[in-house]
Amino acid sequence: ILSPFKFSRRATGDNDVRFKVLYCGVCHSDLHMVKNEWGMTTYPIVPGHEIVGRVTEVGSKVEKFKVGDAVGVGCLVGSCLSCENCDDDSENNCAKQVQTYAFTNVDGSITYGGYADSMVADQHFVLRWPENLPLDSGAPLLCAGITTYSPLRYHGLDKPGTKVGVVGLGGLGHVAVKMAKAFGAHVTVISTSESKKQEALEKLGADEFLVSSDSDQMQAATGTLHGIIDTVSALHPVVPLLGLLKVNGKLVMVGAPEKPLELPVFPLLMGRKVLAGSNIGGLKETQEMLDFAAQHNITADVEVIPVDYVNTAMERLVKSDVRYRFVIDVANTIKTE
């Protein structure tokens, strides 16, 4: 259970950008971390890695941003900036990466996230916010947007006419559908819940809908998809999903179940299929994603909440009772003394 916690941000360094937090998304990983379900949480924890705000101060060496700019910070606030991965704009794969909260920073302090009134980050990890992208419904793109955009691009599922499956229609899944449609893909939503069919097809613009427990539907769709983005963070069978793939098809996991998947090898051997994972993206690609989202009017479907509602929001998140992301209105509801 989250409760008010007082702390101070570091002084604004030469390369730092300080900003007033306006909105912060509530991500499913915040819930996992608050409950220590992944076994890596250090308390006290201040969650939040979908952070949007306005710059209040910049360090002497900051050239990309000025006071008053709208900016975002996603899942990363640090990396070594000198390894092979960082040189390749893949800071999310740096062995010395510093995540936005509950991570040890270079100075030994623990990072605190965006459920807070202000944020300070090195300019390299601050994103320019596109003018026509709403701050509130755009905030979840800093995690959900890049988490789905990056594997679609990397695995070549971003070409018009590509047949893409999206497993799960939650915070990640509904954004994956929008991203894939913007790339021109033919999108099939795969869900355990028939009740989401109308929403998937009519509201989000998916082309087809499969109920994963309906063996006839799954059988009829065998071998039809070039790739699948699996967004489900609860344990679920993956073998039926591999059956939906064409030869050389790719199943990319972006949800993070806490228990291991059951995976026989034969469904991979037959048809040379690939089971892959993907974890956010580098800063350059995240900026590209925000610009792409602004160009195609992609935002998350959000329910904006006051900060004191966050525990209730977490309880509702456990029950998947949100369409599709909570966003905290930090600026108007957090009390600062």
UniProtKB/Swiss-Prot annotation:
Entry GO MF terms: mannitol dehydrogenase activity; zinc ion binding
Family annotation (SMART domains): PKS_ER (SM00829)
EC number in record: 1.1.1.255
Matches recorded under SUPFAM superfamilies: GroES-like, NAD(P)-binding Rossmann-fold domains
Keywords from the UniProt entry: Metal-binding, NAD, Oxidoreductase, Zinc
Catalytic activity field: D-mannitol + NAD(+) = D-mannose + NADH + H(+)
Zinc recorded as keyword: yes
InterPro entries, per database record: ADH-like_C (IPR013149), ADH-like_N (IPR013154), ADH_Zn_CS (IPR002328), CAD-like (IPR047109), GroES-like_sf (IPR011032), NAD(P)-bd_dom_sf (IPR036291), PKS_ER (IPR020843)
Cofactor: how bound: Binds 2 Zn(2+) ions per subunit.
Chain positions recorded as Zn(2+) 1 binding sites: C27, H49, C143
Binding site for Zn(2+) 2: C80, C83, C86, C94
Required cofactor(s): Zn(2+)
Pfam families linked: ADH_N (PF08240), ADH_zinc_N (PF00107)
Purpose: Oxidizes mannitol to mannose. Provides the initial step by which translocated mannitol is committed to central metabolism and, by regulating mannitol pool size, is important in regulating salt tolerance at the cellular level.
PANTHER family for this protein: ALDEHYDE REDUCTASE
Family named by the database record: Belongs to the zinc-containing alcohol dehydrogenase family.
Protein name: Mannitol dehydrogenase
Biological source species: Petroselinum crispum (Parsley)
Lineage of source species: Eukaryota, Viridiplantae, Streptophyta, Embryophyta, Tracheophyta
Gene transcribed to yield this protein: ELI3
